[in-house]
């Protein structure tokens, strides 16, 4: 699932859209060492302004009813035929929230298009019961040799580029 070695076609690019509206923040600011140290891969976090989260790219969603705050999206043909896998987390440690903080809008195995709603989150519950509302977006699988340019500004869900990936 997390294999990182594949051959890539040269001069191929892909753009990931922001899954939420808000300021883009370095993963190092996320209060979870797994993400802050980029153990799962490179990425950026979003400080969401509202509770709508959308797909950052076209692909197939993997999620679980027990973890409605985590969405893996796998795209088979994003960089020269090599897959990408992106993990979108809603909040940090949001699985600890006792009240239902995240309502899924997609099912496991469903095909999604970039900008399609994934879930709606209650940010007030997350603020009260999770470590943070900062929502990591991690590139967990990408072809070897991919240059990743991450965004650093304010983003609008489904329209602002979060990251640009380029074959080197």
Residue ranges: model-predicted function:
Residues 1-168:
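Contiguous, well-folded functional domains in the mature portion of proteins
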């Amino acid at each position: 699932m997390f294999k990182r070695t594949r051959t890539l076609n040269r001069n191929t690019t892909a753009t990931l859209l922001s899954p939420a509206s808000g300021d883009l923040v370095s993963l190092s600011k996320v209060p979870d060492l797994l993400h802050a140290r980029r153990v799962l891969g490179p990425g950026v976090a979003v400080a969401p302004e509202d509770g709508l989260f959308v797909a950052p790219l076209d692909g197939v969603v993997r999620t679980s009813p027990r973890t409605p705050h985590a969405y893996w999206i796998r795209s088979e043909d994003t960089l020269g035929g090599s897959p990408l896998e992106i993990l979108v987390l809603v909040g940090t440690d949001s699985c600890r929230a006792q009240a239902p903080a995240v309502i899924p809008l997609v099912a496991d195995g469903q095909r999604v298009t970039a900008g399609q709603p994934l879930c709606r989150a209650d940010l007030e519950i997350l603020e009260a019961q999770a470590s943070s509302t900062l929502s990591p977006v991690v590139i967990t699988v990408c072809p070897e040799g991919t240059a990743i340019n991450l965004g650093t500004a304010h983003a609008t869900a489904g329209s602002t580029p979060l990251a640009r990936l380029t074959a080197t």
